[in-house]
Amino acid sequence: SQDNGETAYQTAKEVLKKYPEVKGILGTSSFDAPGTARAIDELGLKGKVFTAGTGMPAANAQILKDGSVSTLTLWDPANAGYAMASLATKILNGETIEDGVNLGVEGYESMHFSSGSTKVLEGTGWLKITKDNVDSLGF
């Protein structure tokens, strides 16, 4: 969608018309799930076609609650910020950053270097956002 909700909507609509057997669409841009949900609703496919993606809770609360989107994921920005600050502190203190480093933040307790990299760390700090928890996240 190139980070464009209208493009996500138009593309999803075209795909769903051309390939009616499609059961789900996963978006990677925060604009994909809302655009895809709009196409699903417009084509009368709510409850028949699944969509999920990334997105902010407050901006997507309605489409989660009405079932247009079942799940969104993202990193908690506060936790990600604390993890980055922890990593920066370790580096500034001269600590060696090794595979498995614990940054002391939930989801960032066992960081691993991305395949083939000694600079990019990956953790498990994903949040799963559903209609059941969307209002409790505060952002």
Model-found features: residue ranges?
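Short glycine-centered helix-capping/turn motifs at secondary-structure transition points
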Residues: L43-G44, G67, L137-G138
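Conserved beta-strand segments of alpha/beta enzyme cores
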Residues: F50, S70-T71, L127
